[in-house]
Amino acid sequence: MRRSRPHSFYVLSVLFGLFVLFLYGPMLCVYLLSFQGPTGGTSFPMRGVSLVWYQTLFEGGRGVGDLGNAFWRSMRMCVIVAAFSTVIAVAAGMAYRRKFMGSNFIFYTAIISMVVPGIFVGFGIALTLGLMGLKSDWWYSGVGSQLTWSLPFGLLIMFIVLGRFNPAYEEAATDLGATARQRFLYVILPIVLPGVIGITMAGFTSSYDESARSALNMGTGNTMPMELTALLGAATTPAMFAVGTLTTLFMFALVIGTLLLVGRIAKRRQLSLTRQQPA
């Protein structure tokens, strides 16, 4: 006989449903309003349904500013920040497998930027560059400011991944005569690769969304979030909603592609282990 659910289950279910509605309801409004008609505004009711604001976005029409250049600038920064975050996090994770002098100090120095307000970090970087007589530009001061946000997450992910790594695999490779380079490339890296991909994804997405730290360090160009913030103070059109919809689709595609890649890697590893088992 099936047991009836307690009343608390239904209460918690309603609360969870309200939370999901509160979280995703505004996003749904943004997606709907992006299909507003040519005479429509940035609020309901809908005045027709069309793709005119997507067309305006790609043709550089009214109310879209310099979104094209801002988008590609953000993409370049995302790739650079993700690459630096991945390489530094993996190197630091390998180094922290053994204790060394000053390891705790270096760790907390790297992590503390997560809790320091981003605007103060960005202001400190801009002030330091000014004292050195250097002008801000996206490719060094902008990237550096965003690394103070993305790198701590990469470090924490890598420490967790390597903390679960079984050293017996590395010891077996050593017994078979593998060098340090071979152990890393053919034993350690394939096992921790899903975590490394996670670090790359975290670095990419955190860089794309970051604006507080890089606002004072971008030089003459804006990133996508900065350009959108600037446009919100001007005459706002549903083109902003079209940008939000396309950005969401792009990020979903990126996440799904990453999950498929990680799943394929895990499947190949499982097949490799199955073939190595004795009959």
Model-based region annotation:
Residues 2-9, 41, 51-65, 207-265, ...:
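Interhelical loop and adjacent transmembrane-helix boundary motif
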Residues 1-7, 79-110, 123, 127-131, ...:
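Transmembrane-helix boundary motif in ABC transporter permease subunits
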Residues 1-33:
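N-terminal signal-anchor/first transmembrane alpha helix
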Residues 24-39, 73, 122-137, 201-209, ...:
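A structural signal for multi-pass alpha-helical bundles of membrane permease subunits
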Residues 14-27, 155-158, 166-167, 180-209:
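Transmembrane alpha-helices
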Residues 69-73, 128-157, 193-195, 243:
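Loop-to-helix entry region at the N-terminal start of transmembrane alpha-helices
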Residues 25-28, 32, 87-91, 123, ...:
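Membrane-embedded alpha-helices of multi-pass transport/permease systems
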Residues 44-45, 104, 119-150, 181, ...:
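Membrane-interfacial helix termini and adjacent extracytoplasmic/periplasmic loops
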